[in-house]
Amino acid sequence: ARIVRRGQLYPQLLLRGGVVARRRGLADCKAVDLCTGTGIIPLILSYKTNCSRIYGVEVQQNSYERAVRSVQRNGLQARVQFFRSDVKDFCSGQGVCLRDSVDVVTCNPPYTQGQGGLTNANSAKTIARHETTAGLADFVQCAAQLLKPKGSFFMVHRPARLVDICVAGRTYGLEPKELCLVSPKEGEIPNILLVHMVKGGGKELKLLKPLAVYEADGSFTARLRKCYE
């Protein structure tokens, strides 16, 4: 089976964040995308939601510069802003003014735990895929610090880290509310997890209908295509 790539599924997570913002009628809502890479999620958020201020946080210089150029070329400087920062330092540094004020935080963090056995822990690919500069708990903690009460945190990760995600969420006051498992094709073992947490939310978890990415012929499923509309 073809492997689900991280970037293909992130719009599903993103659109759920947009639905939350629209449902609340937050014309002046704020959104932050952690591990933003080249900034595609803030750009899509600017198109799909009514958030007035959208921020992206990226640790790698090259990706950060590309994200800034994209905003400039699209004339979105009034709504979208990027910060070059490690997630562990963001809420006490450049992002201190955003603490407890954000409505929606999204995050597509590195999936692989630790640096054990890595030959080049500083390469761009390694930083993007492995927890070299920050761990899972750091991303959850940062989201909790940014969100206002009842704000929503949406994360993409691997099913193997589900327990770690839930433990970190409760540790920092983010209650898991919705969970969706994603598989490459119908009937195959899920390899992606979508989770929605709420700051100070009640203790009730809803399992959403599983999502398949590909049809038997290799094309995207209708449900996934709808995420891109």
Task: Give residue ranges: language-model regions.
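SAM/dcSAM-binding transferase cores
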Residues: 187-229
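Mobile active-site "lid"/loop adjacent to the S-adenosyl-L-methionine
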Residues: 109-138
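Conserved Class I SAM-dependent methyltransferase catalytic core
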Residues: 133-190
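A general structural signal for well-ordered alpha-helical segments in protein cores
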Residues: 13-16, 38, 42, 124, ...
